[in-house]
Regions:
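Active-site rim helix/loop that mediates acceptor-substrate recognition in acyltransferases
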Residues: 28-51
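Conserved GNAT acetyl-CoA-binding A-motif
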Residues: 101-113
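Helix-loop element at the rim of GNAT/NAT acetyltransferase active sites that forms part
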Residues: 17-32
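Conserved beta-strand in the GNAT
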Residues: 59-67, 72-79
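A short beta-loop-alpha structural element at the N-terminal edge
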Residues: 2-17
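Conserved acetyl-CoA-binding loop-helix of GNAT-fold acetyltransferases
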Residues: 80, 86-99, 123
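Conserved active-site alpha-helix within GNAT-family acetyltransferase domains
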Residues: 113-131, 135-136
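Conserved beta-hairpin
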Residues: 48-64
Length: 148
């Protein structure tokens, strides 16, 4: 059973470790995950909220950061442990974030290898509004969802 709760700054080391696992799955050694200005975990702790997904033994298997920007919900740093990807952890995190930041519009930046990685987001009603090619066969997708 997975439970969701707000993360605190004391979780930063575990979040960075989770971020590294996701990065290692997507990119060659030493290459950072793409992020835009203001989208670091520290930024979300300072100006928004970070949710974490925990197993019964308190192992962190997922996280997402969100905040309100110009009247819309802005999400980034959607991180799910590689062994738990595609098992609805992403969906649970996004649905919970919707309840915490109930805005009429959501924007999510999401790095992925291909559009198949976007399935959980598309299932929730997000649409791809922009796709930016990145090195190493990745793309940064900007997804939006109206009427949350």
């Amino acid at each position: 059973m997975i439970r969701l709760e707000k993360a605190g700054r004391e979780d930063l080391a575990a979040l960075v470790q989770l971020q590294e696992m996701v990065r290692a799955r997507l990119l060659p050694e030493g290459q950072p995950l793409p992020e835009t200005a203001g989208d670091s975990l520290e930024d979300f702790f300072a100006h928004g909220v970070v949710l974490r997904a925990l197993m019964e033994d308190d192992t962190m298997v997922g996280a997402v950061g969100g905040r309100e920007v110009d009247g819309r919900q802005h999400l980034a740093q959607l991180l799910v442990h590689p062994q738990w990807q595609g098992q609805y952890v992403e969906t649970m995190l996004l649905l919970q974030m919707e309840s915490l930041l109930p805005e009429a519009r959501r924007e999510l930046l999401f790095p992925a290898r291909d559009a198949a990685d976007l399935r959980p987001l598309l299932w929730l009603g997000d649409t791809v509004s922009e796709e930016t090619p990145l090195p190493h066969g990745l793309a940064l997708y900007r997804l939006e969802k109206s009427s949350i």
